[in-house]
């Protein structure tokens, strides 16, 4: 096994690359949902009237030192979502990630938002995809902990995950606490999960973070 070179803490924190990116989408047409209604109309058409403007905007900050240290945050507002109102603190969705890799016996430590792959993805896999390398990677049973920096509001864990190596033995553990959108029945049970991440109308906002997914595991 190739040992990673030792890196001083100061180099890890200051020797990497900072990057800030932003995206703004300005539509050239206007949907009926953006027309400003009276309060009575808004209440009667809770799923037809958008509460925010028609702009889409996100901003990202990332820091990376080689393949050893990553951190950053993402903030996003979808078109039609309110900005700084209706319970939103400015943007509708926020994400933070921190990932440290190959630090002695600690192979990976993730804080904030992350993705997992255990048991070739048959046990846990929040990072599944099909591609040219899928068959070549099937023999790799080592657990994977990856940073999550996407604007997607689903298919990730939020909390802490760590992987250690003691000789030829790998050990991993994780805990996640993730608020999730859902449609609830009158008795409080879940009717369905909402996975599109959109909170543009009163009805969509009423489904925001109604339930919490807690996950814990070891490998």
Could you describe each region identified by the protein language model?
Residues 1-219:
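Outer-membrane beta-barrel channel domains
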């Amino acid at each position: 096994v190739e040992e990673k070179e030792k890196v001083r803490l100061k180099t890890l924190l200051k020797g990497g690359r900072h990057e800030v990116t932003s995206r703004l989408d300005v539509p050239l047409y206007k949907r009926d949902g953006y027309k400003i209604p009276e309060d009575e109309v808004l209440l009667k058409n809770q799923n037809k009237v958008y509460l925010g403007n028609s702009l889409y905007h996100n901003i990202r900050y990332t820091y990376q030192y080689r393949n050893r240290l990553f951190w950053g945050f993402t903030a996003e507002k979808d078109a039609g979502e309110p900005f700084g109102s209706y319970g939103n603190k400015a943007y509708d969705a926020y994400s933070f990630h921190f990932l440290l890799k190959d630090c002695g016996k600690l192979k990976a430590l993730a804080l904030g938002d992350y993705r997992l792959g255990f048991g070739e993805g048959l046990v846990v896999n929040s990072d599944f995809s099909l591609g040219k390398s899928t068959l070549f990677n099937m023999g790799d049973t080592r657990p994977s902990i990856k940073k999550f920096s996407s604007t997607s509001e689903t298919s990730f864990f939020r909390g802490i995950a760590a992987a250690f190596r003691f000789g030829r033995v790998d050990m991993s553990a994780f805990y996640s606490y993730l608020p999730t959108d859902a449609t609830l029945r009158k008795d409080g049970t879940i009717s369905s999960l909402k996975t599109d991440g959109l909170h543009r109308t009163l009805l969509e906002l009423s489904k925001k973070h109604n339930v919490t997914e807690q996950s814990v595991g070891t490998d």
